[in-house]
A protein has these predicted regions:
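Active-site C-terminal subdomain of aminotransferase-like
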Residues: 178-181, 188, 193-296
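PLP-dependent enzyme catalytic core of the Aspartate aminotransferase-like
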Residues: 47, 51-55, 68-71, 77, ...
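Active-site phosphate-binding strand-loop segment of PLP-dependent enzymes
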Residues: 135-184
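Conserved PLP-binding catalytic core of the aspartate aminotransferase-like
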Residues: 13, 271-285, 289-322, 333, ...
């Protein structure tokens, strides 16, 4: 824990815009628990990743990466082993990656996305032909699929504002029966699910069923940007459509991504880390449920649902007053559990949830 002394609370009762990427921090002589960031494995401030970036900058500077650079080849080889990806493109953010992906689909293509999917997907696809589906109602999804010819199915790994794992096998089965192009959305699951964080495609053994794989290095691996993986002919087509967008990325970013993959591939060490992380999340989820709070979460992204936006907003403000930082969206509050959170930290958090829940009449004792 570092003694960060930053200006966090510009307006009383609001979640601060800039919170240090630490599971806990000191502000105003008070210790705050930070559940805001996706950095569940606590790699954002990894000394190994910092040293990797520093050494690469000293050797290569911050010049953009040429597609033929050695580091790109190394990352390609590593991702080929980890994700079974034949070819790869790297992008600085989710939006640019999504726009590049959309370049290979025509105006008549219908995109099927879950109501609970990533916000970046919804933002980019809002001007395309979209059919929303609910993973609870696969019969309706089957009917929707039968009504369209050119179609693409986005399949999620983890729903970031529910905290549960998607029924990917069932959704993929329907998509294959309907001759959909299937895109695995690993933006919220790469680095967290599957063997050594290989993602939900690995967890559900869907390697042979997926046409395109998209994911993020920045959420759980302490790295930068996003990847887009597919067969070589598709990647070549995307590259033709977008020109040299992917070349404007400093090499040190790719070196950090490669180092992050090396960390999670250290089987003995990573196994202990993942076991502790999932033990922490199960402990928190179990106790929240025992209080009578509503959650369907089954991952380290723990989401609690309330009756309405106002109730969740008031709960979030009171959590800040009790030295707990959490994210809120509408009627939901999300806690991103870190491997660095101790049992005492989780007990402190649970106690504050109970105190606030009782004060607001949400928990009935």
């Amino acid at each position: 824990m570092k003694p960060f002394q930053v200006h966090l609370f510009g307006e009383e009762g609001k979640i601060p815009e800039s919170v240090p990427p630490e599971p806990s921090f000191i502000y105003g002589n008070k210790r705050y628990l930070n559940f805001l960031h996706f950095d569940c494995l606590h790699l954002k401030n990894s000394e190994y990743l910092k040293e990797t970036a520093r050494m690469n900058i000293e050797a290569e500077g911050i010049v953009p990466t040429d597609a033929r650079a050695g580091i790109m080849g190394s990352l390609q080889d590593e991702m080929s082993e980890v994700k079974h990806i034949e070819s790869l493109l790297f992008f600085p953010d989710e939006v640019s990656m999504m726009f590049a992906l959309m370049s290979i689909f025509g105006p008549k293509t219908t995109f099927f996305i879950d109501y609970e999917t990533s916000t970046s997907l919804i933002n980019v696809l809002q001007y395309r032909r979209i059919e929303y589906y609910d993973f609870h109602d696969l019969d309706r999804l089957r009917k929707l699929l039968s009504d369209h010819a050119e179609k693409v199915m986005f399949v999620d790994g983890i729903y970031e504002w529910l905290g549960n794992i998607a029924p990917a096998n069932n959704i993929v089965k329907l998509a294959r029966e309907s001759e959909c192009i299937i895109i695995a959305n690993e933006l919220n699951s790469f680095g967290l699910l599957g063997r050594e964080g290989r993602g939900f495609v690995d967890l559900c053994n869907l390697y042979e069923d997926i046409n395109i794989d998209i994911g993020s290095f920045s959420k759980f691996l302490g790295g930068f940007g996003c990847y887009l993986g597919a067969k070589k002919y598709l990647i070549n087509k995307i590259r033709e459509n977008i020109g040299y967008i992917t070349d404007f990325v400093p090499q040190f970013m790719l070196s950090v991504n490669l180092a992050g993959l090396e960390i999670i591939k250290e089987k003995t060490k990573s196994k202990n880390v993942y076991n502790k992380l999932w033990k922490n999340s199960r402990y928190l989820i179990t106790n929240l449920k025992q209080m009578g709070l509503e959650t369907v979460s089954e991952t380290p992204l723990v989401v609690v649902s309330f009756s309405n936006n106002e109730e969740a907003g008031e709960f979030t403000r009171r959590l800040i007053d009790e030295q707990i930082i959490a994210a809120q969206k509408k009627e939901r509050i999300r806690l991103c559990v870190s491997v660095e959170h101790s049992k005492e930290d989780l007990d402190f958090c649970l106690n504050k949830f109970e105190v606030i829940g009782n004060a607001l009449g949400i928990i009935k004792t």
